[in-house]
Design a protein with these regions (language model features):
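Conserved P-loop NTPase motor module
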Residues: 1-5, 10-21, 25, 118-161
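Conserved P-loop NTPase motor cores
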Residues: 4-116, 141
Length: 161
């Protein structure tokens, strides 16, 4: 909706203001954007997101886009450029069409693709600079840290009681 788009732009403006204030105080600003693909649907928020990606680092900002399914991002030339220029990516299990597009965009080998093909939780690929490496994270579930980090609805309900 139009109101939602205005709200998104206002949030982005506030974030940029915070980055500017923090830069003047010699502080870094971490900006986590969940459901990132929603910002790509509207032309103005998509363009602003590109500016954030391009300029934040120079200002001490560290943007992080989070999305469950990369398909929406891969449909957008803007987002494809952002992905290709990102220093650090975490890729978990991917749909077949997404794997093909990611392989082309990021130069992922067939062997590496096996780490994001029909894999379980905690397995995937890390892209850091020009390196792409597989990872397996079998984080112990019986820890307080796991409870704090879990995003699985059933586990959250269990933790909250």
């Amino acid at each position: 909706s139009a109101a939602s788009d205005v709200y998104k732009r206002q949030v982005q403006d506030q974030v940029w203001n915070r980055v500017t204030i923090n830069r003047n105080s010699k502080k870094n600003t971490r900006y986590y954007i969940d459901e990132f693909h929603l910002l790509l649907k509207e032309e103005q928020t998509a363009a602003y997101s590109v500016e954030i990606w391009k300029r934040f680092r120079k200002w001490g900002g560290i943007p992080t886009g989070i999305t469950q399914n990369v398909e929406d991002c891969l449909k957008s030339l803007t987002a494809r450029t952002m992905l290709a220029n990102s220093e650090y990516l975490v890729m978990l299990n991917q749909a077949p069409t997404d794997r093909i597009e990611l392989a082309k965009l990021l130069h992922i080998s067939d062997n590496q693709l096996s780490y994001i093909t029909n894999v379980g939780f905690g397995k995937g690929l890390l892209k850091c600079g020009n390196s792409i490496v597989p990872f397996v994270d079998n984080f112990p579930k019986n820890t307080r840290l796991y409870q704090l980090m879990s995003t699985k609805p059933g586990e959250i309900q269990e933790i909250l009681g």
